[in-house]
Amino acid sequence: MSNQVTKSDNSEPLAPAGEPAIRVIAMPANTNADGRMFGGWLMGMLDQAAGLVAARHALARVVTVAADSITFHAPVQVGDELSLYARLVKVGRTSMKIEVEGWRRVRHELETIKAISGLFTFVAIDEDRRPCQVPPMNETRLLSDKADK
């Protein structure tokens, strides 16, 4: 993702700039036997964040049609804060591609670590649940969305 905040030595980014689409605390109910968060729960959180961005752009109902890629970068533990940043990267006639990154933070520390990332495809649907046209992706709309953050 662009606009990342970096450490003072300009090495690894700390997290994307702006406000996350979703911020949650990892809870015990969503863990595996090792005390780490289930991959399925993490993927669901990415899908929710991407869906919020897609629905906001389409101004319509949206459905997930593909999880084009998902990469696990670091484990998420119980009690970690997970911040999900999502952005629109491509728009078709009825579809949208959304890039999402999930960054974990131990609740009593400042450092953030990229835990998961993915690319999702959504389709906008009308009242009859048929694909409907979405607005084009243009600079004016993208700039106004960034100003909202």
Swiss-Prot record:
Residues 16-128 form the HotDog ACOT-type domain. The keyword Cytoplasm does not apply. This is Uncharacterized acyl-CoA thioester hydrolase ZMO0511. Its EC number is 3.1.2.-. It is an enzyme of class 3 (hydrolase). Keywords: Hydrolase. Belongs to the acyl coenzyme A hydrolase family. One of its GO terms (cellular component) is cytosol. One of its GO terms (molecular function) is long-chain fatty acyl-CoA hydrolase activity. GO terms for biological process: acyl-CoA metabolic process; fatty acid catabolic process. InterPro entries: Cytosol_ACT, HOTDOG_ACOT, HotDog_dom_sf, Thioestr_dom. The keyword Kinase does not apply.
